[in-house]
Amino acid sequence: MTTQIFQLPLKYCASSFSSTGQRNYGASSSPSPIVICKSNGISDGLWVKRRKNNRRFGSLIVKQEKGDVTEIRVPVPLTLEQQEKEKQNRDDEEDEIDEGDVDPEDLKYVNEIKRVIELLRRNRDMIFSEVKLTIMIEDPRELERRRLLGIEDADTPSRDDLAEALEQVNDGKIPKDRATLRMLHEEMIRWPNLEVEVSKKQRGKSMYAKSTDTGIDPKEAAKRLNVEWDSAAAIEEVDVDDEQGVVTKVAGYGALYFVSALPVIIGISVVLILFYNSLQ
C-alpha cells in the first residue's frame, strides 16, 4: 500500500493514547507531517472498512509520524463515478435477490400481460404508448360506483402505479408490488373484444385527390414519405366514368378559380361604384 506525506497548514485536533493508557487531547499549532492511508487497504494489520449505511463518504486514516501514534478518521466525499458505481452494484444485488425469489403466480401474470400487449399490437394496431395511456385513464363509471358504495381504500394501487408496473413488465421485469401486478392483470384480461381482429380499411385517395388531378404518383409519394411498399401498392385508382370525371374536374377547378378571382371582382365593383358617384 502506497502512502503519501502531506503538511497540514491549519490547526487540527488529535487524540492519542499515551504509554500509560490514557487518552490525551490537544491542538497542534504547527504543521506536522502525517501519513494518509486510503481506506481500501490494510494499515498495521487492521482492516479499515467503510460502513455500509454510509454510501456517500469514504474515510481516511491519518497517522502522525512523530510521537505517539494518533488515528483520526476523516470523512472523504465520494466522486460521482464512485456513487454511480455503488448504486449500480446495489441495484444488481437487489435484482439477484429478486430473481431468486420469483413467485410462479407472478410469472404467470407477467406472461399473460405480455400476451395481451401482443394481441393489442397485432389485432388493434396499438403501440405500447397507447396501451399505457389507456391504462392510466380512470373509468368514471368505476369512480361513481365506488362513491355510491362508499368504497375508499387508501391501499388500492393508483392508475400511475398500474402504468409503472406495465412499463416494468414490458421491459422484462417483474413488479415488486404483487397487489399492483394482480390488479394490472385483471385490467388487461378484461380488455373488451381482445381476440377479435379489427378489419383494416383499404387506403384510398382523399376527396381532393378524387376531384382534382394532382399529378402525383401515389407510389412515388409513398417512397418519399417512407411508407411501406405494400401500403403504397394498395392505393389504387378509383374507377370513375369519363363524363363524370370531366364534370368533377370542371367543378373542382371552377370553384378554385372563383375563390381566387373573388377579391379582384370586389375591387373592380368598388372602383365602378366610386366612378359612377363622381359623375353625379
From Swiss-Prot:
Organism encoding this protein: Arabidopsis thaliana
Tissue: Expressed in cotyledons, rosette and cauline leaves, stems and sepals.
Transit peptide, residue positions per record: 1-62
Transmembrane segments: 255-275
Function in brief: Nuclear genome-encoded factor that participates in photosystem I (PSI) biogenesis. Cooperates with the plastid genome-encoded protein PSI assembly Ycf3 in the assembly of stable PSI units in the thylakoid membrane. Involved in light-induced chloroplast development and growth. Involved in the plant response to abiotic and photooxidative stresses. May be involved in the suppression of photooxidative damage.
Name of this chain's protein: Ycf3-interacting protein 1, chloroplastic
UniProt entry keywords in alphabetical sequence: Chaperone, Chloroplast, Membrane, Plastid, Stress response, Thylakoid, Transit peptide, Transmembrane, Transmembrane helix
CC terms in the record's Gene Ontology section: chloroplast; chloroplast thylakoid membrane; thylakoid
GO biological process, one term: response to photooxidative stress
